[in-house]
A protein has these predicted regions:
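Sensory/regulatory domains in signal-transduction proteins
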Residues: 1-42, 72-204
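Glycine-rich short-loop/terminal segments
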Residues: 40-71
Length: 204
């Protein structure tokens, strides 16, 4: 889908200034849905990015057993993913691994990566909003409980310091893996792309 910028021409500088003022006012209006998520059929993975396809194929080959992941596949995938495990009381899912080349690491920075281990998935930190953290956490919990992969298209509003907010569309694959000790972990594989089947919620 192609999007074209819209240019307005006003003969009067007064009306142009009025229009600019109205647009600026709209930018401060809170959006009803800053994060939109669509769960897709697993059959759609064949049309996904190569990273998502490789992650799904590796999960299928290993039958969800982490120790049976092909070492070359693991070396290729692990720098790009997030991993979540239950905490000691098994009450919350927490970050147990953040790949340095993951989208989350690139957006939030090195300090966030270093502080992320042990953080609860549904609580906002870094540049996340609480609404975003809670919405994306639902998929982690579903995958952890069911053991079934989730392939999703997501569009979310990203707000960074000293930058204009922007919409980031991406696809996400969640898979559950059995670890060597017998516990479970959810691996989150994200790939930013414009080819997501989620309507644009509006302009920030």
């Amino acid at each position: 889908m192609l999007f074209r910028s819209v240019h307005e021409i006003h003969k009067s500088s007064f009306w142009a200034a009025e229009r600019i003022e109205k647009i600026q006012e709209c930018k401060s209006v809170a959006l009803l849905h800053e994060t939109l998520i669509k769960t897709c059929s697993l059959s759609d993975v064949q049309f996904a990015s190569s990273r998502i396809r490789q992650g799904f194929e590796s999960w299928e080959k290993s039958k969800g057993l982490f120790e049976k992941l092909d070492q070359s596949d693991l070396a290729r995938i692990i720098p790009h993913v997030l991993m979540f495990r239950p905490d000691e009381k098994e009450e919350n899912l927490v970050y147990s691994w953040v790949g340095m080349q993951s989208t989350a690491a690139k957006i939030n920075g090195l300090d966030w990566v270093e502080e992320s281990t042990g953080e609860v998935a549904h609580r906002a930190f870094g540049c996340e909003t609480q609404s975003f953290a809670e919405k994306v956490n639902v998929g982690y919990v579903k995958t952890m409980i069911s053991g079934e992969p989730l392939y999703q298209h997501i569009r979310t509003l990203v707000r960074l310091e000293d930058q204009e907010p922007f919409w980031m569309p991406y696809e996400r694959l969640l898979t559950r893996h059995v670890l060597r000790g017998g516990g479970f972990a959810v691996i989150c594989n994200i790939y930013p792309t414009q080819y997501v089947n989620v309507s644009l919620a509006g302009n920030p």
